[in-house]
Each structure stands twice: as structure tokens, then as C-alpha cells.
């Protein structure tokens, strides 16, 4: 979904509605203007599974490459809301129903009140697993991921979304005193200087 069709309130309500129907929800942002909602009735351990087994990427690499997913790092870079983050974002939001379908009746897009890429990044930042040092990304996958690659991938989109400089800096901070942390922090400073 293009972020221009949503404001923060609609994003929260859409997330709450999906969580009302499905047990699990993750939100990916493959590019600054797009949100992809992945919902399921069973646990979604996509990143963990891919890091451990290479699946499903290993079975059909060309299929996923069309969407820019060539490594587990590509998927982690796109992940902006894991299950705990999306639950926090959606907490207290009103549901979208047939009788109150704000997705169908909203004039957010028509009035130019939709989110920009930068606004989207800033709204999602507190819930983003890459910006939370206590998230599963660092606890469970940290040793298996090339965070320098993730940061470079994000930097490629920084001209379209200024919030990515802050995201990169927070990744560097989460990595602490390490070679990857030093590299990512330096890249974050460089990206911030270009915007």
C-alpha cells in the first residue's frame, strides 16, 4: 500500500483491524513509499527461518529477487514492524469495519494529507525492530546478519526519505562498540550530511 493513502490514524486502525482477524502481523517497507502487511493465523518467523535455513529464498531465488530480496538482510532491512511493534502501534486504535470503513471513506489522499516517506519513517521509528536494541533482530539474529549491508541498502533510499539517516544511526548505536557499529554510525553521519 502506498503511504500517501494513509495517515497515522488510518495506519494504526488498519493494523488493529488486521490483528483483530489474524494472530500475527508484520509490516515491511520495501521502499520508502510502500508498506506491505503480512498477516497469518500461525507464528511468522520469516527472518529467523531464512537466517537458519535459507528458506524460502533458497528454493525460488529469482521469484524473491524481483522484489529486491536476495538475502535475509534485505528482508530485515525492509521489516519496520515485528509482532510486538505492530501491537504497540495498534494499541487503542479503532477497528475498521463494514459499517465504519474509513479506508473506503477517507479523503486523506485526495486532500494531500497522506504520509510522506519521511513522516512514515518517523511514525514507525519507536516500533521498528532495527531501531530497538532489545529486539529479536539483535538478540537472536545479530551474529548472523551483515548490518553494514543493511545500512548500505537503507542509504540507497535516503534521498527519498530523510528519516533513514536516523534509522541508520540507531542501528549503529544498537551495534555498540564493534567494527560493524563503527561503520554503520559513520555511514549514518555521511547520509545525514547529504540530506
Residue ranges and their predicted role:
Residues 26-188:
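Soluble small-group transferase modules, centered on the S-adenosyl donor enzyme superfamily
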Residues 7-29:
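Conserved Class I S-adenosyl-L-methionine
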Amino acid at each position: 500500500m502506498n503511504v500517501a493513502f494513509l495517515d497515522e490514524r488510518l495506519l494504526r486502525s488498519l493494523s488493529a483491524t488486521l490483528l483483530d482477524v489474524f494472530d500475527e502481523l508484520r509490516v515491511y517497507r520495501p521502499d520508502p513509499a510502500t508498506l506491505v502487511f503480512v498477516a497469518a493465523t500461525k507464528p511468522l518467523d520469516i527472518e529467523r527461518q531464512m537466517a537458519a535455513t535459507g528458506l524460502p529464498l533458497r528454493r525460488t531465488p529469482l521469484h524473491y529477487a524481483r522484489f529486491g530480496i536476495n538475502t535475509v538482510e534485505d528482508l530485515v532491512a525492509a521489516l519496520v514492524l515485528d509482532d510486538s511493534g505492530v501491537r504497540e502501534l495498534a494499541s487503542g486504535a479503532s477497528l475498521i469495519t463494514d459499517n465504519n470503513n474509513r479506508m473506503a471513506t477517507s479523503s486523506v489522499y485526495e486532500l494531500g494529507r497522506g504520509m510522506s516517506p519521511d513522516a512514515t519513517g518517523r511514525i514507525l521509528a519507536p516500533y521498528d525492530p532495527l531501531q530497538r536494541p532489545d529486539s529479536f533482530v539483535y538478540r537472536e539474529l545479530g551474529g548472523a546478519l551483515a548490518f553494514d549491508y543493511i545500512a548500505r541498502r537503507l542509504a540507497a533510499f535516503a534521498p527519498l526519505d530523510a528519516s533513514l539517516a536516523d534509522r541508520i544511526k540507531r542501528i549503529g548505536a544498537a551495534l555498540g562498540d564493534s567494527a560493524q557499529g563503527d561503520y554503520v554510525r559513520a555511514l549514518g553521519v555521511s547520509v545525514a550530511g547529504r540530506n
